[in-house]
Amino acid sequence: MDVRQSIHSAHAKTLETQGLRNEFLVEKVFVADEYTMVYSHIDRIIIGGIMPVTKTVSVGGEVGKQLGVSYFLERRELGVINIGGAGTITVDGQCYEIGHRDALYVGKGAKEVVFASIDTGTPAKFYYNCAPAHTTYPTKKVTPDEVSPVTLGDNLTSNRRTINKYFVPDVLETCQLSMGLTELAPGNLWNTMPCHTHERRMEVYFYFNMDDDACVFHMMGQPQETRHIVMHNEQAVISPSWSIHSGVGTKAYTFIWGMVGENQVFDDMDHVAVKDLR
């Protein structure tokens, strides 16, 4: 488990390129036949990837000591979106088939969660966010046909994109975790511009569906102290509540966003005008 401490905005603005990457970038999300796990002190979110290829993968009791529990989801809820080939997730003996861009919410208290791929040639890639939970909500599969989509932006401003809301109150009930998938239209490069902050939630972005020769310049920092982190395919970045979170790519791309905090109101944000950015 890779533990990332919280960081004050006054400290963050003093960091050079590698310092910013060390604090906020999750460089390797998927490793064959393993799980990756990054624990952030910011709202206690855990993020990572699970890619079963030749065997099943599960998060066992080895994380219990680090989390102060006897099993992974004893006091946590889990959200998973599959960006790879078809797979299965078995929760306490109940098997769910999770295809490409299907998702599964797993409620607090699930003791055994096992991940598998159906075809080793095209393995599943399960990207997950995990957050503290105060009660148990039912485990539920969500397909792309069931999400709450919103299309925003314009080709003229190069920010035409569709926001697919997987885990939001309109779709299912969670304790605090919200997740969704945003896909830019071909030829569009900007996400979340004009940008915003939200003091009541932190966020994690996971960029994917990118060519090897492409990158995204992920914008972060306070609106008057902006910085950037260069992102490549299948990398994630942690965004504290004091930071903007926006990006521009060399080509169109897709990203998964995950939020945890004190509410789940999607529009609870503090907008920042482009003219006010520095």
From Swiss-Prot:
GO MF assignments: 4-deoxy-L-threo-5-hexosulose-uronate ketol-isomerase activity; zinc ion binding
Cofactor requirement: Zn(2+)
The enzyme's E.C. designation: 5.3.1.17
Catalytic activity: 5-dehydro-4-deoxy-D-glucuronate = 3-deoxy-D-glycero-2,5-hexodiulosonate
Top-level taxon in the UniProt lineage: Bacteria
Gene: kduI
Subunit structure: Homohexamer.
Paired cysteines (S-S): none
GO biological process: D-galacturonate catabolic process; D-glucuronate catabolic process; pectin catabolic process
SUPFAM superfamilies reported for this sequence: RmlC-like cupins
Pathways per UniProt: Glycan metabolism; pectin degradation; 2-dehydro-3-deoxy-D-gluconate from pectin: step 4/5
Textual note on the cofactor: Binds 1 zinc ion per subunit.
UniProt protein name: 4-deoxy-L-threo-5-hexosulose-uronate ketol-isomerase
PANTHER family: 4-DEOXY-L-THREO-5-HEXOSULOSE-URONATE KETOL-ISOMERASE (PTHR38461:SF1)
Presence of the UniProt keyword Zinc in the record: yes
The entry's keywords: Isomerase, Metal-binding, Zinc
Entry's family note: Belongs to the KduI family.
